[in-house]
Amino acid sequence: MRNDGLRIEGLTIATLGAHPLMLVEGVGLEVRRGRILALVGASGSGKSLTCAGALDVLPAGVRRLSGRVLLDGEEQALAGLKGRHVASIMQNPRSAFNPVRTMRAHGVETLKALGRHDRRSEAVLLQALEGVGLEDPGRVLGLHAFEMSGGMLQRMMIALALLTEAPFLFADEPTTDLDLVVQARVLSLLEGVVAERGLGLLIVTHDMGVVARLADDVAVMAQGRIVESGPVGEIFHRPRHDATRALVAAHLSLYGLEGVA
């Protein structure tokens, strides 16, 4: 067993109440530094809940029954994982920002939470925005979310996530509601971040095009369980589970094997 990454073991999540419904059951994943793991599955398969459960940020009405996270072989408290060890980019960037606060205010808030807010904060924020390809970062820092496009907001979310300097990044459907050109730019940005910083990236998606474009390894979810996992080429060329075959067949019918290793 490798000990140089982030491992999620035995994660089980259920609804509250006398008769709980299992939503995620016995999920195990491994995210390695410098590699991209795609967690893929149909809507409702448990992908986003898996991310939320691993980071101890589950929504109301559900609870984690079991599961642990190991970093380089050592168990970590889930409550302390987010921010220090794992940065996150969640769905729908527009809803992630307070509409009455500027991007500068959000950036300062992030730096304060990290204990890094000082007289150099403005320069740090400008550099962070430049690093994700936001043009005229000084102007962008003065904008509110409603003044920005979806692509700009997604880049801003990535910039704030990278301020944490965490070795792992969870990205939950980062290209949802973006047009194809902006999607490609965001994926290129994430790919570059992994290559340049050696981050381990877990990307949650239902889009096999994103998987083909970005992933090194793939884990397929169906009905709250991991039903298949392996290198991206193996998943596309030799899918074993019915859920995987359905996802691959739908993608191949539209795009063929273009871009798949």
UniProtKB/Swiss-Prot annotation:
Topology within the bilayer: Peripheral membrane protein
Swiss-Prot/TrEMBL catalytic activity: Ni(2+)(out) + ATP + H2O = Ni(2+)(in) + ADP + phosphate + H(+)
UniProt EC number: 7.2.2.11
Ion transport as UniProt keyword: yes
InterPro entries in the cross-refs: AAA+_ATPase, ABC_Ni/Peptide_Import, ABC_transporter-like_ATP-bd, ABC_transporter-like_CS, P-loop_NTPase
CDD domains registered for this protein in UniProt: ABC_NikE_OppD_transporters
Molecular function as annotated in GO: ABC-type nickel transporter activity; ATP binding; ATP hydrolysis activity
Domain ABC transporter: 6-248
PROSITE patterns: ABC_TRANSPORTER_1 (PS00211), ABC_TRANSPORTER_2 (PS50893), NIKD (PS51247)
Keywords: ATP-binding, Cell inner membrane, Cell membrane, Ion transport, Membrane, Nickel, Nickel transport, Nucleotide-binding, Translocase, Transport
Main location group: membrane
Presence of the UniProt keyword Ligase in the record: no
Cellular component annotations (GO), alphabetically ordered: plasma membrane
Localization in the cell: Cell inner membrane
Binding site for ATP: 41-48
Cited SUPFAM superfamilies: P-loop containing nucleoside triphosphate hydrolases
Highest taxon of source: Bacteria
Family note: Belongs to the ABC transporter superfamily. Nickel importer (TC 3.A.1.5.3) family.
Oligomer and partners: The complex is composed of two ATP-binding proteins (NikD and NikE), two transmembrane proteins (NikB and NikC) and a solute-binding protein (NikA).
Functional summary from the UniProt entry: Part of the ABC transporter complex NikABCDE involved in nickel import. Responsible for energy coupling to the transport system.
Name by which UniProt lists this protein: Nickel import ATP-binding protein NikD
Gene name for this UniProt entry: nikD
